[in-house]
Amino acid sequence: MSNQRPISAFIEKNYLHFNSAALVDAAKAYKKHIAEGKKMLVSLAGAMSTAELGISFAEMIRQNKVHIISCTGANLEEDIMNLVAHSHYKRIPNYRDLTPEQEWDLLQNHLNRVTDTCIPEEEAFRRLQKHLFKVWKDAEDNGERLFPHEFMFRMINSGDLKQYYEIDPKNSWMIAAAEKNMPMVVPGWEDSTMGNIFASYCITGELKASTMKSGIEYMVWLADWYTKNSGKDGIGFFQIGGGIAGDFPICVVPMLHQDLERDTIPFWSYFCQISDSTTSYGSYSGAVPNEKITWGKLNIDTPKFIVESDATIVAPLMFAYILDL
């Protein structure tokens, strides 16, 4: 086994068939895509930030293995929550055995459960809230309108959160993204804790809804970014999980082709999805990649991969392989 890249050597020796082989094929194709000078979008769904994907994903960002990110509002905020409140999280290995009464007790103790991990409301949500409100309010007072991730970047780059850091900041993918001013889209941001908090300030009249740029504006921005960055060969699409984080950005290509009639725009030029959503009737998240050809998202010869497994296991391994670890 190679001493220089022990994880990669282990993967190459042992991952030879079935889902494990699909992992290797997809990771090799990812490396080839980047080596050819093409760019890659990574989408994050589910609770990947709470799963601490930042430990491996932040290094992917620093080493320019990802060029644009699409994520849910939950992933946008939960990486920062883990950064500032890590020691207050509570793990419950036997979560399957919890009674409704025990779940209620967690709520009364301000612990919000995600599978086996409870996020502490006071230390995570409220700690961020006061700093984020200031960023929102200052922007509004200055007549600025920003995207959700831009407000987060501004809060991170201000340094105001450093007093709370409870993990090594190199393990936060949001810090890595903020340092690079990473291109991002956060579709459906309203469906998040900070989205709900922002709405509450709009209800009380302390903020205006128009201060936050919308999902439509994200798509308009993405159309411009894709057009300027796709070249002749297109952008790659690496999808972790399903849902809006993947569905929203992948639609920019058929929109450019069909609605704007820009026929020269290239298709997505690599596609991989890691998902435990099994192929089923009527499921977008569980659809096989070839179905996307019929929607004008992928071309016939786009390299296509699907790893039907738990992304919390698969994604860090693939990132390690791509990083030659």
Model region roles, listed by residue range:
Residues 52-55, 80-86, 196-200, 249-253, ...:
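Short acidic, glycine/serine/threonine-rich loops at helix termini
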Residues 102-193:
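Ligand-binding beta-strand-loop-alpha-helix segment within the catalytic cores
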